[in-house]
Amino acid sequence: LRLFYQEWGFSGDREAYFDSRNAFIDQVLQRRKGIPVSLGSLLLYLGHKLGFPLNGISFPTQFLLSLNWPGERPIYLNPFNGEIVSQHTLQAWLVGHKGPLAKLKPQHLQSVDNPTIIGRWLALLKSALLREERYTLALRCTDLALTFVPDDPYEIRDRGFIYQQLQCHQIAISDYQYFIEHCPNDPAAELLKTQVNALSHDSQVTLH
């Protein structure tokens, strides 16, 4: 950790957390700044190369790492700053995220596989690109995510939004309808029905 954070100078970007450069690994390596999932992924790679028993954890509030020496309790690391995180702190984070009745459970601290880590990274990168209105790159993130979860209605809904911004209304309508059919009870479904009607009307006006 001293090598990574002090000698090499990696750190979490507190000033521009949602900057997409904090998710692109090449930019993280160049700038020495990132977010938990990008810094954590680099630490995982380095740790595995050096033989450390590191694992990724998709904690609700942010990506974490666990160091699991045989016969010892796991040590939880915050890759944003390299600090050890106690279970008391994790409980506090969970309460802040989910409410006062939230309880820290073993499943919150389970190790995850590489596809899950990639999925979390893609979601954060896509979110950053959407904030920056870089829709073509955001679409590539969604397409890549759908190779892992081809039928995920929420990912398909997001793809529909991106296609709408790219003025590809017919494809957007198709994606929105897929979400409405598969998640009829989601609050977003009613809003998307209105959006589909508006897009359909716009398409008809354009055709005429």
Language model region names:
Residues 1-208:
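A structural boundary/capping signal
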